[in-house]
Structure formats: structure tokens, C-alpha cells
Amino acid sequence: MRALEGPGLSLLCLVLALPALLPVPAVRGVAETPTYPWRDAETGERLVCAQCPPGTFVQRPCRRDSPTTCGPCPPRHYTQFWNYLERCRYCNVLCGEREEEARACHATHNRACRCRTGFFAHAGFCLEHASCPPGAGVIAPGTPSQNTQCQPCPPGTFSASSSSSEQCQPHRNCTALGLALNVPGSSSHDTLCTSCTGFPLSTRVPGAEECERAVIDFVAFQDISIKRLQRLLQALEAPEGWGPTPRAGRAALQLKLRRRLTELLGAQDGALLVRLLQALRVARMPGLERSVRERFLPVH
């Protein structure tokens, strides 16, 4: 019998090799499903069983003649990964008082929570978004994961109140409005304009209300020290002397002074300026008294 040579030998080798090559795709396909070792309690046989996909659990392990049986997770339970658990995990995440549900409990994942609107997550707690103080504006609103981002108002802009949402606003342009500049704008208040050019010292005339409002703004928003603001407030409250004033910031004192002057405007018929000039003398503020006279009292 002649031995095969050349092309005949190559063809025979290929035919013999085919049975060994065919199972490879099947083995590769099985390997894509995770497995786990299992010992059959009845036969003592050691088996390799397929795991169950997310959202299910092992209802019955595989046997020599049957694959793994997987069952769906019951309500309020889940499995997130391929597994060989005998029961699904309970959805044990509960949202706190300052949290809301970001993702509901599902067969494939636990419940997820996030901080409610107005709060952000920090070190495991939901903290309230900070407010930017007067003189600073919001550059990035707070999110569930980040606090409010503030920055000082740049020149030409202002923010008059504490806010977690307001940006710095541009100062108004008095000239463009056809008005006179009363008080220059700062980082914490707008430019104050007026149409007032001066009014009699003690007589109320038509249109005097605009001048009275201008006087109030002019005095209340002067760039003076907190100590002097306190002295003037106390002089307006008690002309004969004053007691201690609770500690407060400049912006709060300016607003309080503005409210007090507005109260005096309503209570004293045409005598606001007289009363204010007296208080400035009592508070030992000759410079501001002189500025008020030069700005609002006509020269005779």
C-alpha cells in the first residue's frame, strides 16, 4: 500500500482535524456566561453550573442532565450582577428627609436617592445651598452634588440681597435716564438717581416727595463707618442720648437707617430735613451735614 504524499496527505490531515475544531465556538459561547462550581447533594457529583443574569436568582442549581433554573426577583428585591444567590437582595436604601428618589427600586438595581432641590450632598449629608451675601453674586447655582458658587460683584455691578440664585446686576445709568446722580452705586446697592435739584428747608411743595426720597437715599447709603451709622441711628431714635446698638453689618444698618428716615418722613409734615440735620449734629457728623446742605438746600 502506497503512502499518501503531496496534496493527498494535506487533504487527509484537514479532514481529520475538523472534528477537533468544530466544538470551539460552542465552548467559547458557554464561556461567555459566568459559571460557578456546585456539588450535587444527591449524587455527590461536582458540577460547573451557569450563573443567573441580573434581575434573577438561582431557583434550582444545575444537574448532570439539566441546566441552572433561574427565577425572577420578587417585588422590592433585586440582583445587580450575574450571580448564584439563592434569594434576591432586598432594596434596603431609604431616602432621608432632605432626599428624593432618583431611581426607583428595580429587579436589577437598588433604590438610589439624591438631595432635594435647595440641598447638596457633602460628607454623607444633604446641606442647604449657601446664599451669596450682599455684594456677591451667583456664578453657578447649587446642584444636588455641589454648593452655590459665589463671586464678589465686579466694578459696575451690584447685588443688594442674600440670594442663592441671583447674579450681580449692572448699575443703572442716571444720565441715560435723564436724571441726576444721587448716590454712586456700590457692590451692594444700585446707583441711585433723582430728579430733585433742591427744595425749601421746611415747606412742603408739589414735587417735594421726590426730594425727600433723594435725601433719605443720599444719607442712608453714604460710604461711612459702621460706628458712625450706629451713632446716627441712635441720634434719630433718642436725641438726648443713646444706648448700645446690637452689632450688625453695614448693609443691615444702612437699610435700618433708610427705614427709620422713611418713618420720620411719614410722621413729620415737611420737617424731615430739619430733623435729619439736627441728628447729624448730635451724632457729630459735620462732613455729612455739610454735604446734605450743599446738595439739597438752595443757596440764597
UniProtKB/Swiss-Prot annotation:
Biological process terms in GO annotation: apoptotic process; negative regulation of apoptotic process
A Pfam family that the UniProt record links to this protein: TNFR_c6
PROSITE patterns: TNFR_NGFR_1 (PS00652), TNFR_NGFR_2 (PS50050)
Renumbered ranges of TNFR-Cys repeats: 31-70, 72-113, 115-150, 152-193
Keywords: Apoptosis, Disulfide bond, Glycoprotein, Receptor, Repeat, Secreted, Signal
Tissues where the protein occurs: Detected in fetal lung, brain and liver. Detected in adult stomach, spinal cord, lymph node, trachea, spleen, colon and lung. Highly expressed in several primary tumors from colon, stomach, rectum, esophagus and in SW480 colon carcinoma cells.
Domain of life (superkingdom): Eukaryota
Paired cysteines (S-S): 49-62, 52-70, 73-88, 91-105, 95-113, 115-126, 132-150, 153-168, 174-193
Cleaved signal peptide residues: 1-29
Residues modified by glycosylation: 173
Gene3D superfamilies, alphabetized: Tumor Necrosis Factor Receptor, subunit A, domain 2 (2.10.50.10)
Compartments, as annotated in UniProt: Secreted
Main location: secreted
GO molecular function: signaling receptor activity
GO cellular component terms attached to this protein's record: extracellular region; extracellular space
PANTHER family: TUMOR NECROSIS FACTOR RECEPTOR SUPERFAMILY MEMBER, TUMOR NECROSIS FACTOR RECEPTOR SUPERFAMILY MEMBER 6B
Function: Decoy receptor that can neutralize the cytotoxic ligands TNFS14/LIGHT, TNFSF15 and TNFSF6/FASL. Protects against apoptosis.
Protein name according to UniProt: Tumor necrosis factor receptor superfamily member 6B
Organism of provenance: Homo sapiens
Lineage, broadest ranks: Eukaryota, Metazoa, Chordata, Craniata, Vertebrata
